């Protein structure tokens, strides 16, 4: 069968090649016209397309009380996550397709992935609280350690020969392996102080110092101790429960009113593992030889993103606690944004990770809940909420006005004065409901099977 006709000279057509034979007369066919029924029949099996994920989690929380006011606690957890995945595109039902990374057409492919991540966390905390008449004080302090290791192994190969041997081996065309072996850790010291007076005025102050193996050793910000840089993150919150004032007792419809405000500084340490490391990667030369080429140049100045934030809030209960209203507003400014930055062509690389740019966020949310019916055995509540959040890029590195990034075949733009990570698409003008409308617009199909010549 070829070009829509049956020929006697195509006696060697097999299940795996019939689509290639059928499309042999077309120079620009759409390889996405694979047979979905054949893909399900020949591509589904535990040794073909299969995904398995398992997790083991252990946690202990011992606590020792010295007396009624002083205690020492520990939170230790261990998490093991394993992922095993097989991916297979069958020969039968799928025509040859173009693999851009190889610059050539291939019949089918087989892939496998196995990953393992170990995560250990330890949080040791000392707590003290005391009340002096109308004054209540609580102090907490401790240190938190986190250690992670991640191993990833991947394999890929093309042209298995038939769908009965979907196994990956060195005999496959363009067979390749990859993977990573990452280990990182972080350490944080923190203190927190809470104070309230007669349940009316509340104050909270926090301070944390944190360092991570992912940070560079020569960051612009932070305090250097023990040979590494530490980020310092303070915070302060205050609130007033107005309904606990004696002069508010006469307002029967208002059961609870709390006003709060605060400021804090936080950091984002989600740095790529290799951002501060220079490393080599294997490279194939025309399929004839393999070697090592420099794949990344570490940036020892890279650091955490820093966000400074203010917030205000109102909590109220009214009408004998049958109606609750919550309102929160925040505004934040983030600097040292983590992003790709261009490198000199002399380095042999296009980009590397760095800090640059600034971003503003602001928004609010409102929530209302109401008790429609309440009885000792049954309660009915309804609620509604609405929120609005908006961000704007205020600066980019190297004096740039905008930056374009290619992600999964799409272009994402980050531009000063506009929201981060913009992407655009076509707007649909409508759907043709009849063939006459499509013909009037000059649209048609060349062949009955929809193949474009």
Where on the chain are the PLM-derived regions?
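Extracellular/periplasmic, surface-exposed regions of secreted and cell-surface proteins
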Residues: 1, 5-8, 32-89, 102-418, ...
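Intrinsically disordered, low-complexity regions of eukaryotic proteins
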Residues: 10, 14-18, 22-23, 317, ...
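A subset of solvent-exposed loop/turn segments in beta-rich extracellular surface proteins, enriched
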Residues: 13-41, 93-104
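Extracytoplasmic gating/loop element in the C-terminal half of outer-membrane beta-barrel translocons
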Residues: 212, 433, 445-451
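Aromatic-residue-lined binding/catalytic grooves and analogous aromatic/hydrophobic interfacial grooves
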Residues: 372, 378, 434-435, 447
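A penicillin-recognizing enzyme superfamily signal
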Residues: 438
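Extended repeat-based solenoid scaffolds, especially LRR ectodomains
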Residues: 441-442
């Amino acid at each position: 069968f070829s070009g829509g006709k049956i020929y006697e000279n195509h006696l060697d057509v097999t299940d795996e090649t019939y689509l290639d034979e059928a499309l042999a007369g077309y120079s620009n066919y759409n390889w996405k016209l694979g047979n979905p029924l054949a893909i399900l029949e020949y591509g589904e099996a535990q040794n073909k397309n299969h995904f398995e994920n398992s997790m083991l989690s252990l946690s202990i929380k011992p606590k020792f009380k010295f007396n009624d006011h002083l205690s020492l606690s520990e939170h230790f957890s261990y998490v093991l996550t394993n992922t095993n995945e097989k991916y297979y595109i069958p020969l039968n039902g799928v025509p040859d397709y173009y693999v851009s990374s190889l610059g050539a057409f291939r019949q089918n492919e087989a892939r496998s992935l196995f990953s393992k991540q170990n995560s250990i966390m330890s949080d040791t905390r000392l707590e003290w609280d005391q009340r002096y008449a109308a004054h209540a004080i609580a102090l907490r302090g401790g240190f938190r350690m986190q250690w992670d290791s991640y191993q990833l192994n991947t394999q890929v190969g093309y042209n298995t020969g038939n769908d009965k041997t979907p196994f990956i081996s060195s005999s496959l065309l363009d067979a390749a392996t990859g993977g990573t072996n990452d280990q990182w850790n972080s350490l944080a010291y923190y203190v927190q102080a809470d104070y309230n007076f007669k349940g009316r005025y509340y104050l909270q102050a926090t301070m944390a110092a944190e360092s991570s193996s992912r940070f560079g050793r020569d960051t612009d910000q932070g305090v250097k101790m023990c040979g590494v840089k530490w980020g310092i993150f303070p915070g302060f919150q205050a609130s007033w429960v107005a309904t606990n004032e004696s002069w508010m007792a006469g307002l029967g419809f208002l059961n609870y009113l709390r006003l709060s405000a605060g400021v804090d500084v936080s950091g984002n340490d989600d740095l790529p593992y290799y951002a501060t490391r220079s490393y080599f990667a294997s490279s194939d030369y025309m399929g004839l030889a393999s070697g090592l080429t420099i794949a990344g140049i570490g940036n020892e100045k890279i650091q955490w993103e820093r966000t400074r934030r203010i917030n205000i809030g109102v909590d109220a209960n009214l009408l004998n606690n049958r109606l609750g209203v919550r309102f929160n507003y925040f505004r934040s400014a983030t600097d040292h944004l983590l992003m790709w930055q261009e490198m000199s062509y002399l380095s042999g690389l296009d980009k590397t990770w760095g800090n640059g740019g600034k971003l503003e966020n602001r928004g609010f949310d409102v929530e209302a809940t109401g008790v429609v019916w309440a009885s000792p055995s049954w309660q009915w509540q309804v609620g509604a909420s609405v929120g609005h959040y908006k961000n704007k890029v205020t600066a980019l590195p190297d004096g740039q006005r905008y930056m374009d990034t290619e992600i999964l075949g799409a272009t994402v733009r980050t531009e000063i004065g506009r929201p981060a990570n913009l992407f655009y698409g076509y707007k649909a003008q409508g759907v043709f409901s009849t063939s006459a409308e499509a013909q009037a617009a000059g649209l048609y199909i060349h062949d009955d099977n929809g193949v474009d010549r």
